Amino acid sequence: MLNMSNIMSNRNSTPEASNVSSLRPPSSRAIGSNHGLRASADVAALTGAQAAASRIRPSSDFYGQPQSGQVQGNAELDPQDKLAQQWIADIDQYETTLEEMAAATLDQDFKDELSAIEQWFRVLSEAERTAALYALLQQTTQVQIRFFIQVLQQMGKNHPMSGVLSPANFDKDPMSSRLSDAMGKLEVGSARNSLARPSGGANKRHSGLDQTTINTMFPDAVAAIATEKAKFTQQTGNPPPSNRNSLVDNRNSLAAPTVSGPKDDINGQNPASPWGPSDTSRPKSSTGQTPMGQFVQPPPSAGGLRSPRPPQLSSNTNIQSTTLTAAEPQLTELPLLSPYTSSGNWASMVNTPMVPTFGQTQGNNADMVANATAMKLAALSTVNNRFALDDARRYRRARSNDGAPGQSHAQHPLSPGPQGIPSTNVVMINEHGQVLSHDHVLALQQQQQQGLQQGLGGFGGHRSRPTSPGIAMPNYGSALQFTSPQNNGFLSAYDGGAPGLINNGLVPMMGQFNLGGHHAEGYLSDHSEINRGRSPRGRRGSSKPPEDPTDPTLLQDIPSWLRSLRLHKYTDNLKDMKWTDLIELDDKQLEERGVNALGARRKMLKVFEQVKEAKKEGKI
C-alpha cells in the first residue's frame, strides 16, 4: 500500500520535477528504495520555500511559468543563468518598446496630441518642466523606468548638459530636430499600410518599419540598446539572441504584439501595461481606427508559448484576455461588432426574417448617394469659386417693352406723340463718355426719320456697336422697337434682308457725332456680347456712364485712365509716360511700346485726338 501511494504521488508530481530528478548525478541506490525520497522531495517542493530558492532553472521558466519543484544540486548556476536571461529579456523589451514608440509616433492623431503637449511644454519655466516630468515619471512602470534609465544615460553622454537644461534651446535640441526631420520625410499613409503586414522573416520587425527609420527617429535609444548588447557580448562572450524574430519558434510571449498588452517576464508574472491601463479611454487617437502600436500577427497556435501553461495558474483569466488582445487587430477591417472573417455577413449568422429588416437603411443610403451626387455636380459647375447658374435678378437686362438702359437717366418716360422728344431731363452719352446735348438728340431723331422715309435699305454697310440702344421712336409704332439690344442681336442673322431695319438708319448720323460708323471700321460688332448677356460697353446691369477720357484729374493717373478705356492690359507699357507725351504718340510708336493689337492702337489714337481737341478748346 505504501508503494502504491508512492507511485501515485510520483505520477502527480510536476513534469518539470521529474525532469530535474533525471539531472541528478548517478547513484548506487536502487530505484525502488528511492520512491520514498522522491515522494518526500515532491511534497517539499509543494510546501517548502527553501528548495524553490535554490532550484535549477527548468525550460518552462523560459515561457514565464512559475516553478516550484527544484533540487539543491547545481545551485551555483542559478545566479548567472537568471542574470543572463533577465538581461536578454530587457534588451528584447527595449527593442520592442522602441518599435512601438516609432509606430505610435507615426499616428497622425497622436502627433496632433503630442504637438499640443509640446507647445504647452515650451511655455513652462525650467522648474515647471522639471515638476511636470517628475509627475509624469510617477506614472511609469518598471519596464519604462529601466528603458528610460538606459536612454537617459546615453543622452547624458551625447548631449551637453547646458543644452538639455536650457529652456531657450528646447527647439534646438538635436533629438527634437532629428525626430521632426524623420517624421517629415515619412509618408503616414504608407506607414499605416505597412503596419498591417505580419513579420515575414527573421530580419523583419513586427512593426513593419525600417530599422533606418527607427534609428533616425530615436538615435539615443538605439545607441543605448546597442551599448547594452555590447556589454552583454563582452560579459558572456556571445551576442544576445533575438527571441522575437526566430524562424523556429514564434515567441509571442517575448514579443508582445501590443505595447499596451500584458507581457510575461522571467518570473512568470504578468506585469502591468507599460503605457498604463487607460488606453481605451483616450478621447481622440484610439477611436475610429486601430491604435498605433498594435500590429496584425497570426493568432497563437497550439504550439505557441501560451498553450503549455498549466491550468492551475491564478493568472489564467488574464492570459485569455491577452490572447484576445493579440488577435484583435485582425478584425479592424471588418464591420463593427462582426466576430467573423471579412467574408462573413449578418445574413449567414441568423435566420432569414419574415419582414425586411434593412429596407429603411437602404432608402437612407440612396438619399445619401443622391445628395452626394448633387453636391458633386454643383461643385463641378463652379467657375472661379462661383456657381455658374442663371443670372441674378439684379443683373438681368430690361425687357424690350420696358425701355432701354439709357432711359434709366430719365426722370420721366418719353411721352408718345408726333411732337418728338419732349423737353424732359434726358441724358444721352456716346461710347466715349461724351454727353449729347438736346440739339444732338433732336438731330438724331430727324436723321432716323429721314432714313425711314427714304427706305429701310441702303444703310446696312458698316455695322457698329449700337451707340445708344433703346432710343424710343414713338411715331413709328412697333417697327422701331428693334432698337433694343435683344432685338438687334436677334435680327443680326437677317442682315441681308433688312439691314436698315436693324440699324434704324443710324449709321449716317453716327459719323457726324463721332458715335461709331466708319470711324470704327477696325471693330465691327456682331452683337455677340448681347447674346452672351453682356452690355455693349462691357458693364453688367450698370447705368453708370463711363468716365470722360478728357477729364484732367483722370489724365494725371495713366493707369486709371487706361482702365477707363478698357485698355488696362497696356498699363505696364505706358504708365511711365505723362499724358502730354502720351497723346503725341502715333501708330508706329504705340506698336513699339508694345501695343500690338490694331484695334487698341486705333482706339488710343482716337482718344488722343479727343484729348488734343479738348486741350485746344481749353478744357484741359
UniProtKB/Swiss-Prot annotation:
Gene Ontology MF, one: nucleotide binding
Predominant localisation class: cytoplasm
Gene Ontology CC: one annotated term: cytosol
Start and end residues of each SAM domain: 553-614
GO biological process: nuclear-transcribed mRNA poly(A) tail shortening; protein transport
Keyword Cell membrane tagged: no
InterPro entries per the UniProt record, alphabetical: SAM (IPR001660), SAM/pointed_sf (IPR013761), SMAUG/VTS1_RNA-bind (IPR050897), VTS1_SAM (IPR037635)
Biased composition annotated in UniProt, kind: Polar residues: 1-25, 232-255, 267-292
Keywords from the named record: Cytoplasm, Nucleotide-binding, Protein transport, RNA-binding, Transport
Disordered as annotated region, ranges: 1-34, 189-211, 231-317, 398-423, 527-555
Subcellular location: Cytoplasm, Cytosol; Cytoplasm, P-body
Keyword RNA-binding: yes
Family designation: Belongs to the VTS1 family.
Oligomeric form and interacting partners: Monomer. Binds to RNA.
Task of the protein: RNA-binding protein involved in post-transcriptional regulation through transcript degradation.
Name of protein: RNA-binding protein VTS1
Lineage: Eukaryota, Fungi, Dikarya, Ascomycota, Pezizomycotina
Gene name tied to this protein: vts1
